[in-house]
Amino acid sequence: MTSAPTLASPLLDRPGAVPGDGPDAGVARHYGDPLREQRALVRGAGWVDRSTRGVIAVPGPDRLSWLHSITSQHLSGLADGTGTEGLVLSPHGHVEQHFVVAELAGTTWLDTEPGTAPALLAYLDSMRFLLRVEPRDVTAELAVLTVAGPDAAAVLTAAGLPAPPSLWAVVPIDGGGFARRTREHEVDLLVPRASLTGVADRLSAAGATPVPRPSHCTPGSPKSARSISGAPK
C-alpha cells in the first residue's frame, strides 16, 4: 500500500525539535534530549505529536452498520461516547488498514497511519453503494496529540482538558475535537489543527514533556505503551 504525503506539524517549530524523516517525516524525531523525554512516559507525563495521522469522519444514519459490514470490528452496537479499533482486511485475510475509532454525536471518527487516509477513504467510497453515509478526509482539520504516562490524567485536568474516566471512553473537548482513552495512562486528543500548538503549550505548562514518537525510542530506554505493544504510531 502506498502512502500519501503527510502534513508537516507546526510543533516542529518548538525549540530543540529535530525533524523526523522517512515514514516519520512531518513530526519531530526528538526535542533535544531523547532519553529524558522518554523517561517522562514512565515517571510523569509526556505529549506525543501524532499529527501526521490521517483522520476520516463518517456521518450518516447507516454508518455503524455499514462499517460493521466492511471492517473486522463489531461496530453496529458501538455506543455514543465510546471507541475501539478496527482493521480492513484483504480477501486473503491480510491487514490492509488499521484504524482507531471514536463514536461521538452522530459521527464515527477513524484515525489511521500517516499517509494512509486517502487509501482508506477510497476503500470506504468504493463500498458505499446506496447507503446513507458520507465519509470524508478531515486530516487537514483535525490533528492527533497523545498524552501518556502515570500523570497523564492529572496533566490533562491541570491543562483544562478532559480526562476520559474509563478505557475507550470518548469525551468532547470545548472548542472542538474530543479526548479518547486508549490505555490506563494514555489519552488521544483529536483537536482542530489550528489549535494544535495552543493545546501543546497548555499541556507543557501543566507539566507534560514533549516526547518523540515510539519509533524513535533508544534501544534499552523506557518506551511508551504504544511501542511496547506494537500498536500504531
Say what each PLM segment does.
Residues 1-233:
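Basic, glycine/lysine-rich polyanion-binding surfaces/domains
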